[in-house]
Amino acid sequence: MAIHKVLGIETEYGIFVRNAPEQNPIAASSLLVNSYVSEVAQAGAGPRIGWDFGDEMPANDARGVLEQYVQPPDVETHLVNAVLTNGARFYVDHAHPEYSSPEVASARDGVVWDRAGEEVLRLAMTAANRTLGDDQQVIVHKNNSDGKANSYGTHENYVMDRAVPFNRIVARATPHLVTRQVFCGAGKVGCELPGRHDVTYQLSQRADFFEEEVGLETTLKRPIINTRDEPHADPQRYRRLHVIIGDANMSEWATWMKLATTAIVLAMIEDDWPMPELRPMTPVPTLRRISWDLSLAETYQTLDGRTITALETQRELCALARAWAAEHDTSVVGGVDAVTEVLGEWELVLDDLEHDRERAADRVDWVAKGRLLGGFAERHGLAPGSAKLRALDLQYHDLRRDRCLALRAGLRTLVSEAEVVSAIHSPPTDTRAWFRGTVLARFTDQVVTANWDSIVFDTGSSSLSRVPMMEPTRGTEAILGEMVASSADAAE
């Protein structure tokens, strides 16, 4: 039976320092994170609490084996790490600043705390730039590619029932992950694979960089289905599906639908809802061909021999989801009203993309960006894929408000600025993130380290105290609010 889809987003941001003698992204990222954490701590709005790496197990593979020649992901304990009072993690991952949102209980809340991450990065830029010379400036982009064949990720995480066979997840999640780019692709000028100069614009920023159908790695030989088995919860009950095949969306609607539709598909898989064979015969080439085809008419062959388009696949999945929702408890993915809204938006965007894609420009990033770029190219007589269009592509994702083209694209907003501002420092109330963020703010001097599934306190006794948080839906305000509010210190 499907379980509650607690979820979250990890975003690695692009970074560079304007007018720097040489680019050092690790140093720039460290400056960014440290500047934010120091400024927040000085303002009394948050502590300087480090990350507890004790439970990090990136080499654990859901298939139970580590294939020969596979390089397991590194745990970079030496780089800057901080836990924020909103329950998030803000740190340096390889050569990028990364914001990992707190666990949330709905796709809409996923949007709120993802947007809060954008504001954290904006505040961090301001803080970092105060330390630089007048001619230098840290600039951050919410995108997935530097245009020079280097990609950085936007990863999603979904709690799933451990009892579900992993091969069922692979078989039934792959079609959605390969084809959902038609409505949640962020758009990209050009192609970063050798010899594909004919691709001047495509749906997805990440499609060029995937090489495997299933695998453990996240930076090399990237797989459509990642097998990292690191649940950050009770490993006997839960698995965390780590989805690395997704774009960094500027559209709130696209972020919401990316999370909501995927959560529904995963709930269907947990319930073993009958699904036709939609898996591509060749998943990686299919992923790329779909991204490169702006007509959305590209077909692929399923494992059972059918020929189908990405839009048709999404229509089938949407119809299956509607049938599933009619017979199952939808509270695991937000409830009847939320699911009804998602299904309606799902059908509508597929209709718009098929019949008049311009109608989707207020929701779908690749359409919105393509319209901006197309208008600019026409006005200035630019060839497709020109350097100026590549620069505008980057500017779409620029977090500086006075430069960000996405803010001028007429994208639909789903959440209020007040919600986002609150979420910068406050955690969601209905997951364990509430306890993490609240005790960090309330008992700052007694928290030693924290991670997703535990917090270590120094209560003044002879040994440190570790409080496990192995249940993602516990540690909420409803369960612990009165106790925390009535406690004078962590020992109580």
Give names to the regions the model predicted.
Residues M1-Q136, V140-H141, A171-A186, G190, ...:
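Terminal catalytic/cofactor-binding subdomain
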